Amino acid sequence: MVNKEEAQRLKELGNKCFQEGKYEEAVKYFSDAITNDPLDHVLYSNLSGAFASLGRFYEALESANKCISIKKDWPKGYIRKGCAEHGLRQLSNAEKTYLEGLKIDPNNKSLQDALSKVRNENMLENAQLIAHLNNIIENDPQLKSYKEENSNYPHELLNTIKSINSNPMNIRIILSTCHPKISEGVEKFFGFKFTGEGNDAEERQRQQREEEERRKKKEEEERKKKEEEEMKKQNRTPEQIQGDEHKLKGNEFYKQKKFDEALKEYEEAIQINPNDIMYHYNKAAVHIEMKNYDKAVETCLYAIENRYNFKAEFIQVAKLYNRLAISYINMKKYDLAIEAYRKSLVEDNNRATRNALKELERRKEKEEKEAYIDPDKAEEHKNKGNEYFKNNDFPNAKKEYDEAIRRNPNDAKLYSNRAAALTKLIEYPSALEDVMKAIELDPTFVKAYSRKGNLHFFMKDYYKALQAYNKGLELDPNNKECLEGYQRCAFKIDEMSKSEKVDEEQFKKSMADPEIQQIISDPQFQIILQKLNENPNSISEYIKDPKIFNGLQKLIAAGILKVR
């Protein structure tokens, strides 16, 4: 029973304990308060804060999720959730959570500060991880050979290690899906083997024993099934024998595509022996071939309804549900077909039906998306989004652009507009995905290149920004946005290369870039960088070689190489 007054009293006691650092007592008071008012989102937020202060981050995360589920538009809930994920070192998840909160309140200082902090930690952690990983690969001949075979090997290995760090409890599941070379790299990175209970030989023996047991069980099931079938044949009535004769004739007609004749034989079989569910199953198949889908549905439903009178087996009923699903698919009644497949799986959970269900769900989603397309309505939502954008209401602008894209997913301008809204919301990676999609749809769309350049500039990827602006200028040499962006970026690179200060954030980001790592790990470039360090004026020697000059430009733009 809800008692808000008691909940409020307990909350105040919990707050007092929290302020005094008595977090265990605070947890008790907040938990008791929730018992009295289980729909008060603030209580779950306070409980999450108390758990986090005790270092009990899993419980803090659970409470924060409950808070958000009750009140999705309350920014503090996202602060609590992000804090718990931060404590669990789920930095990428924390970043996403803070971004979710900023969608609701873009100017929330606490969310902005938390996002900045977690991003910096994430970049630093990645940089340290990459440096350690590269050192292991370079000093291990086997791993180094894998890198030579596949230049993407370090990146794949890094992603696997990050997955393990985020979900240590799932390490065996993660490794079971990896290529053996990746698993080897993971083991060398962590310094021990993940072999399960016992050694590899014992594990193989255990698997062999299990396989042998499965084989024997399957053989026993098949033997029993044959015995049951034989018993059935010996106990068959004259009606069953006569009914099967008509069924076999119907099957022959069916193979010859003589469906009228086949239908007649199956109906004869049913008339003689109405309790054999498979006669109805065959009859439904004929109706489907004759495109009499209503009759096929009627036949299947009748047989399923009388399954107990027919003493039908589970697998037989599952087959009827599958046939019912096919009938509904042909009638474009996808929801009913999906329901039929799901009921089939209850009777007999097999791979073929699971695959058919997944394929149907994909088909339904695809057709619904296609049916939803309406360029006129897309234009309406785009215009609404533009109005919101002009009024600096960027979350609602994004929502309108989302709907416009659903209505017309092949319009490059819509992705560009949404990228602009996402940029204002500081969701640079998502905005970059949108401009890349816009360019994919229209490679001549200059505005998309200028926005791509701006995003790389904001993300301090100055060389990539220059490339984007340059591509836009190739398409339109007089484009004002690309010209100004290029000049701004070139000035920033020049200023940065001559400055004594180092932009730590940009430096960490650059060192985590696989392209930069490849350049600085190249032996030839290491010699060049050493010479430039001794004599900066020697850079003129390398400008003539396009490959070397291109690499040097990238290092300068990345803030790694200074030119004074």
From Swiss-Prot:
Residue ranges of domain STI1 in the record: 513-552
Region (Disordered): 199-247
Alphabetized SUPFAM superfamilies for the sequence: TPR-like (SSF48452)
Induction: By heat stress (at protein level).
Coiled-coil intervals: 197-239
Gene Ontology CC: cytosol; protein folding chaperone complex
Regions of compositional bias (Basic and acidic residues) in chain numbering: 201-233
TPR repeats: 7-40, 42-74, 76-108, 243-276, 278-310, 318-351, 378-411, 413-445, 446-479
Intracellular or extracellular location(s): Cytoplasm
InterPro entries given in the database record: STI1/HOP_DP, STI1_HS-bd, TPR-like_helical_dom_sf, TPR_2, TPR_rpt
UniProt keyword annotations, A-Z: Chaperone, Coiled coil, Cytoplasm, Repeat, TPR repeat
PROSITE patterns with a match to the protein in the record: TPR (PS50005), TPR_REGION (PS50293)
Free-text function comment from the UniProt entry: Acts as a co-chaperone and mediates the association of the chaperones HSP70 and HSP90 probably facilitating substrate transfer from HSP70 to HSP90. Stimulates HSP70 ATPase activity and, in contrast, inhibits HSP90 ATPase activity.
The protein's assembly and partners: Monomer. Homodimer. Forms a complex composed of HOP and chaperones HSP70 and HSP90; the interaction is stronger in the absence of ATP. Interacts (via TPR 1, 2, 3, 7, 8 and 9 repeats) with HSP70 (via C-terminus); the interaction is direct and is stronger in the absence of ATP. Interacts (via TPR 4, 5 and 6 repeats) with HSP90 (via C-terminus); the interaction is direct.
Protein name: Hsp70-Hsp90 organising protein
The species this protein was found in: Plasmodium falciparum (isolate 3D7)
